[in-house]
């Protein structure tokens, strides 16, 4: 009997010693791993400069997240500037290194080399189809053309404001606009928009819902069309869907990281008369120079003043993001 008790006690003590040994081994192993990991971090820390730069993500729904550099406070050292210009500017300048020259000049104003991007576009119409405003600050140059005043105004209204948009299924539904901030925005290679207002019995007012030829044409073969109809009235629409996409959009407010500079013209285009523009100020300016070199020199000279009336990027705009948030 005593032999059995001694054996039990001995077994218990041996088990206790064994467990203690295992725990110490595990502890030593974990300490080794942790200390090695910390050593690697300490060694690599001086070689790594953490940055939290903005990432160009497609903005959808009502997401509104600012992406900012959080490690330094310099205004321009951590910012990017995009300068959009018509291709005719590069043609007139006829210098393969003209952008490098301007980059060096921007450097004198505090913009590091590589922070300024130059992006050409063919014409107002083509730029309207695929506006890509990815930088923290975006300056769009538009040369004045008396025949394109309305196109220029529509483009300015699009890029100087933010829009929350939803798809429209015009084959199944009628649509109405609720207020002055509610517009229908169409983009594509050729957008022809026709509308037929409806009464409470869904009968056409001055048109027949079964005859699209009786519809009123509000846009004809345009690349960008911002359509405004009578609020609170249902409409049946006809759209060239094979070459155009239409969205039901709500103006949210100004897009403060975009400025438009009009080159030439007797008067600057004024889109502030729109009652949905509040406050009645816009980031639109005018430069009256005949030669493009003078235009760019002026922009370099006053770039910091221009940027001061803007706010750093909070949203990106591209053709994919347009369909939900513009």
Swiss-Prot record:
Region span, LVD motif: 237-239
Protein's cellular compartments: Virion; Host endoplasmic reticulum lumen
Glycosylation sites: 69
UniProt GO MF annotations: metal ion binding
Binding site for Ca(2+) 2: 177, 228-229, 231, 301
Residues reported in the UniProt entry to bind Ca(2+) 1: 95, 206, 214, 216
Record's comment on post-translational modification: N-glycosylated.
InterPro entries (alphabetical): VP7 (IPR001963), VP7_1 (IPR042207), VP7_2 (IPR042210)
Top-level lineage group: Viruses
Major location (coarse): virion
GO cellular component, one term: viral outer capsid
Record bears the keyword Disulfide bond: yes
Span list, region CNP motif: 165-167
Keywords assigned by UniProt, alphabetized: Calcium, Capsid protein, Disulfide bond, Glycoprotein, Host endoplasmic reticulum, Host-virus interaction, Metal-binding, Outer capsid protein, Signal, T=13 icosahedral capsid protein, Virion
UniProt family annotation: Belongs to the rotavirus VP7 family.
Miscellaneous notes: Some rotavirus strains are neuraminidase-sensitive and require sialic acid to attach to the cell surface. Some rotavirus strains are integrin-dependent. Some rotavirus strains depend on ganglioside for their entry into the host cell. Hsp70 also seems to be involved in the entry of some strains. In group A rotaviruses, VP7 defines the G serotype.
Subunit composition and interactions: Homotrimer; disulfide-linked. 2 Ca(2+) ions bound at each subunit interface in the trimer hold the trimer together. Interacts with the intermediate capsid protein VP6. Interacts with the outer capsid protein VP5*.
Main function: Calcium-binding protein that interacts with rotavirus cell receptors once the initial attachment by VP4 has been achieved. Rotavirus attachment and entry into the host cell probably involves multiple sequential contacts between the outer capsid proteins VP4 and VP7, and the cell receptors. Following entry into the host cell, low intracellular or intravesicular Ca(2+) concentration probably causes the calcium-stabilized VP7 trimers to dissociate from the virion. This step is probably necessary for the membrane-disrupting entry step and the release of VP4, which is locked onto the virion by VP7.
Protein name: Outer capsid glycoprotein VP7
Organism: Rotavirus A (strain RVA/Pig/United States/OSU/1977/G5P9[7])
């Amino acid at each position: 009997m005593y032999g059995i008790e001694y054996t039990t006690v001995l077994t218990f003590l041996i088990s206790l010693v064994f467990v203690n040994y295992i725990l110490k081994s595990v502890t030593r192993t974990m300490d080794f791993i942790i200390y090695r990991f910390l050593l690697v971090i300490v060694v690599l820390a001086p070689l790594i400069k953490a940055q939290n730069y903005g990432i160009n993500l497609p903005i959808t729904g009502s997401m509104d997240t600012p992406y900012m550099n959080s490690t330094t406070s310099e205004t321009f050292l951590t910012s990017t500037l995009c300068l959009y210009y018509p291709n005719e500017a590069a043609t007139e300048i006829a210098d393969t290194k003209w952008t490098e020259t301007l980059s060096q000049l921007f450097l004198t104003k505090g913009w590091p080399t590589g922070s300024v991007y130059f992006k050409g576009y063919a014409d107002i119409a083509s730029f309207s189809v695929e506006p890509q405003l990815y930088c923290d600050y975006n300056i769009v140059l538009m040369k004045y053309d008396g025949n394109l005043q309305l196109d220029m105004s529509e483009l300015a209204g699009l890029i100087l404001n933010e829009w929350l948009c939803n798809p429209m299924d015009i084959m199944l539904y009628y649509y109405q606009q609720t207020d002055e901030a509610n517009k229908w925005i169409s983009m594509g290679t050729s957008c022809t928009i026709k509308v037929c207002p409806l009464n409470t019995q869904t009968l056409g007012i001055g048109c027949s819902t079964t005859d699209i030829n009786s519809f009123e044409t509000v846009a004809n073969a345009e690349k960008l069309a911002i359509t405004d109809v009578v609020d609170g009235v249902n409409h049946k629409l006809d759209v060239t869907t094979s070459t155009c996409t239409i969205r039901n959009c709500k103006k949210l407010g100004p897009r403060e990281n975009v400025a438009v500079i009009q080159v030439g013209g007797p008067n600057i285009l004024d889109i502030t008369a729109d009652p949905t523009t509040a406050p009645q100020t816009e980031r639109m300016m005018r430069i009256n120079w005949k030669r493009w070199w003078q235009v760019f020199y002026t922009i370099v000279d006053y770039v910091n003043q221009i940027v001061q009336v803007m706010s750093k990027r909070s949203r990106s705009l591209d053709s994919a993001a347009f369909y939900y948030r513009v």
